[in-house]
Structure formats: C-alpha cells, structure tokens
Amino acid sequence: MSSSQNNNSSWIDWFLGIKGNQFLCRVPTDYVQDTFNQMGLEYFSEILDVILKPVIDSSSGLLYGDGKKWYGMIHARYIRSERGLIAMHRKYMRGDFGSCPNISCDRQNTLPVGLSAVWGKSTVKIHCPRCKSNFYPKSDTQLDGAMFGPSFPDIFFSLLPNLTSPLDDPRT
C-alpha cells in the first residue's frame, strides 16, 4: 500500500477498494460502533479502533487478516438489517454481483451467498433466484462466504419477492 493511501483513506475505504471486494457494501460507522452488533465478535475493541480511524495505521498489524474477518462478520449482520438490505438491493439492481450463467435464466441478476456461516469454510458464490442454483462468480473475488452467509438470498427475496420470476415450468 502506498503512503498516499495511508494518508488519505480510512481502513474501511482501503478495504472496500481492494480488487475483489466489490460484493461488499459499506457498513455505516454507527452500526459498527453499536455494541449490540458486536456481540460475540472477538477482539472487537482493538479492531474497532483500527478500522474506524480516519487514516490507516500500518503499524497496527491488523491491515488485512483480523480486520477482514471482523468487518466481514459485521457485514454479514448488517446486510440483514433494513439499511443493509437497501444497500444490497441497490447493488443487486445495478447488477454488481453478476448474472446467472444458465441460459434459461436470461441473465437474471444474482446475489452473493456463503455456503456456511462459519469463517474459513468456503469462498462466496453467487445465487440465482430463478433457477435456485449457486455458481462461482466471474469476478476475481476470494471473499469468505461467511461475509454473506447461507440465508442471505432467502431473507432478501422473502422481503423483496417481486425482484425475480420463477423459470417457466414446461409442464404447465
């Protein structure tokens, strides 16, 4: 990371700007600081100090590993909140997560999904609401699937059911 990045951006700005992290949305500072949202997360006070600083502190040792996991777990909680669903809806409507590779789905927009809510089990996949299948994303991302979790598409589409239509059933 260059020194100009150190002086001009926060840890969150830096992290969200890393190639491959485009599936993530910005979690607002007030949400991150709310102790209720931090319950069960390890080392939250040390990591919180680093990720909320207005400039990156490269001497902290938390530039990527622990900060990535901590932000990812807060992100997984945030995208289930009303504000988080709105942010993810915007990204979904823009097609930020890609489209379904199944030709029958006619380039249906997809959502990120984790196959597990446990950190380190798998990388993020994309989920098509039409064919109900999961695929590897075309984008170059190695985000942990726990940043979204396995229930995110179900929650999203149960609250916003008009965003997709099922595949035509040839039997009808």
From Swiss-Prot:
Function: Unknown. In males lacking the Y chromosome, its strong overexpression leads to the appearance of proteinaceous star-shaped crystals in the primary spermatocytes causing meiotic drive, possibly by interfering with normal casein kinase 2 activity.
InterPro entries named among the record's database cross-references: Casein_kin_II_reg-sub_N, Casein_kinase_II_beta-like, Casein_kinase_II_reg-sub
Family recorded in the similarity comment: Belongs to the casein kinase 2 subunit beta family.
Induction comment: In wild-type flies, it is strongly down-regulated by double-stranded RNA (dsRNA) interference mediated by Su(Ste) transcripts. In males lacking the Y chromosome, the absence of Su(Ste) locus, relieves such down-regulation, explaining why it is strongly expressed.
Tissue: Probably not expressed in wild-type flies. In males lacking the Y chromosome, it is testis-specific and constitutes the main component of star-shaped crystals.
Name the record gives this protein: Stellate protein CG33246
Assembly with partners or alone: Interacts in vitro with the casein kinase 2 alpha subunit (CkII-alpha). The relevance of such interaction is however unclear in vivo.
A GO CC annotation given for this chain: nucleus
A Pfam family matched in the record: CK_II_beta
Signal sequence interval, chain numbering: none
Gene3D superfamilies: 2.20.25.20, protein kinase ck2 holoenzyme, chain C, domain 1 (1.10.1820.10)
Disulfide bonds: none
MF GO annotations: protein kinase regulator activity
UniProt miscellaneous comment: There are multiple copies of the stellate gene in fruit fly, encoding proteins that are extremely similar, which makes their individual characterization difficult. Thus, most experiments probably do not discriminate between the different members.
